[in-house]
Amino acid sequence: MTHTLHLVIHGRVQGVGYRAWCADEAVSRGLSGFVRNRREGTVEAVISGPSEAVAAMLEACRSGPAHAHVERIEEALAEAPPAGTGFRVAATV
């Protein structure tokens, strides 16, 4: 069963390689979606795939890469991205 989450990650998550780390983690788990910086200092992501892989990715996002410090993650259900789109780092909004 496919599960899709919209995440907003708060904390020290910009300038620490969070987006590249997130994309690598998502691709290694076979997920689709995107990750991007937001001008107010958070990182936004949509992750979609098998429920177990999405749950594991969410747990990984709570820690992030070595220099990140995640304070909290807002999560909400979201619509799945179009099939076959893969996972990408998107432009800042």
Curated annotation (Swiss-Prot):
**Domain of life assignment:** Bacteria
Keywords, sorted A to Z: Hydrolase
Residue stretches making up the Acylphosphatase-like domain:
4-91
Q: Which Pfam families match?
A: Acylphosphatase
| InterPro entries per record | Acylphosphatase, Acylphosphatase-like_dom, Acylphosphatase-like_dom_sf, Acylphosphatase_CS
Q: Catalyses which reaction?
A: an acyl phosphate + H2O = a carboxylate + phosphate + H(+)
Query: Does this entry carry the keyword Hydrolase?
Result: yes
- Top EC class per UniProt? hydrolase
Task: Give the positions the UniProt entry annotates as the active site.
Answer: R19, N37
Record keywords: Hydrolase included? yes
Q: What is the E.C. number?
A: 3.6.1.7
A single GO molecular-function term is:
acylphosphatase activity
What the entry lists under PANTHER family is as follows: ACYLPHOSPHATASE
The entry sums up its family as follows: Belongs to the acylphosphatase family.
Name this protein carries in UniProt = Acylphosphatase
- Species of provenance: Azorhizobium caulinodans (strain ATCC 43989 / DSM 5975 / JCM 20966 / LMG 6465 / NBRC 14845 / NCIMB 13405 / ORS 571)
